[in-house]
Structures are given as structure tokens and as C-alpha cells.
Design a protein with these regions (language model features):
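Short, low-complexity N-terminal intrinsically disordered segments enriched in polar/charged residues
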Residues: 1-32, 128-129
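A solvent-exposed, acidic/Ser-Thr-rich amphipathic alpha-helical stretch
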Residues: 23-75
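Short, surface-exposed coil-to-beta transition loops
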Residues: 63-67, 96-102
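Short beta-strand edge/turn micro-motifs at domain boundaries
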Residues: 100-128
Length: 129
């Protein structure tokens, strides 16, 4: 897998790989000290743990990007913000769409060091199977 040089392209590749559940390839884009935080102060210790946590929330989720912004211009350190909406399917196979999200990524030396996630998913009723 060719790793992009531009911070926004690294982030988009990571998110695309995560959506397809290509975890080893996604892991290759992460710094050794990578940390992630999701709504409710959930901080899964690994990508595998994130997927396990998500299994209790929805069957799948996709992102539609409205904005991707890069702060910082050098490749040593950059912050990338992605915002848009989530769509997918709840556990009972009911579709959802239009749920707002913002992801903030910190990159150092071309690798993702931190991901912080905010979304409005909690404002929507999550049907149970």
C-alpha cells in the first residue's frame, strides 16, 4: 500500500480502510503512541477493540464528507479536521442518515497520533434487535 504524503490524504485513507475493516492496513498509518477518543469519553486501546465496541451500536457506518481542513503546513506536525454526516444501519437493520460528525486528527511525521471524534449519534434512538 502506498502511503500518501499529504496529511488530509493520510486521514482519508485511514478512514476508508476503517470503513472497509482493513485493520492491518489502517494500523500501518498510526504512530506507536496512537490514541483515540469517542463520545462518552470512550478510548478503545486498539482498532480491534474499537470494532468490538461498535458492534453493540450499529451494523455499519459510512461517512459523507462536507469539509476536510488541514491546520499546519509542515509534514512534521499537522491537524486535520473532517466533518460531515454519518449514514448506516442500526443493529435491527433500520437505516440511519444525516447524523453530524467531526473528527480531529493529529499527525506527526506523516502518521496519525491522535483521533478525537464528536457526533450526534446519541441524539438518535438506537433500535435494539
Amino acid at each position: 500500500m502506498a502511503v500518501p504524503r499529504e496529511p488530509d490524504q493520510v486521514v482519508r485513507l485511514f478512514l476508508d480502510l476503517m470503513e472497509r475493516r482493513q485493520l492491518p492496513e489502517a494500523q500501518a498509518l498510526l504512530a506507536p503512541d496512537f490514541a483515540m477518543t469517542f463520545p462518552g469519553n470512550v478510548s478503545p486501546p486498539s482498532l480491534d477493540a474499537l470494532v468490538e465496541w461498535a458492534k453493540n451500536r450499529y451494523r455499519f457506518v459510512r461517512k459523507t464528507y462536507e469539509h476536510v481542513e488541514v491546520c499546519g503546513t509542515d509534514h512534521e506536525h499537522a491537524v486535520v479536521y473532517c466533518s460531515g454526516t454519518l449514514s448506516g444501519e442500526w443493529l435491527d437493520q433500520t437505516p440511519f442518515e444525516g447524523i453530524r460528525f467531526i473528527d480531529r486528527f493529529e499527525l506527526r511525521s506523516g502518521l496519525i497520533r491522535r483521533q478525537s471524534v464528536w457526533n450526534d449519534m446519541a441524539l438518535h434512538t438506537i433500535p435494539q434487535p
